[in-house]
Amino acid sequence: MKYEKSCGAIVVDDGKVLLVKHNAGHWDFPKGHVEEGETEIETAIREVKEETNIDIKIEKENKYISEYSPKENVMKTVIYFIGEKVGGKDKPQIEEVSDVEWIDVNKAVERITHQRSKKIMMQVIKDMNL
């Protein structure tokens, strides 16, 4: 069994959440693989910047964890943190992302493609009283 770990952030700003549309067609939170020597939080901040051009900070270490098997003999763990926008202008990373959008938190659950991410969004809405 191969194990993979990715980290990302759920960035909420003024009642909207930052989502990316991957080139494969699915909508999700920005995330990516942890690079050698990087902490989980550093990975989340870097991936949001790379995929969306948005700068964020992560102050709380609240984690939302999703585990699934994307293919046979592979188990993937994705760790999301809550990010706060501190700068940058939306711009998709064309190698991986076809669109970047700030979506009203109440509509985000509908827009997100995968059920596991929908559940995380619902939990964030509850936890943050959005």
Report the location of each language-model feature.
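Small-residue-enriched segments and motifs
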Residues: 7, 56-59
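C-terminal alpha-helix
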Residues: 123-130
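Unchanged
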Residues: 34-57, 64-123
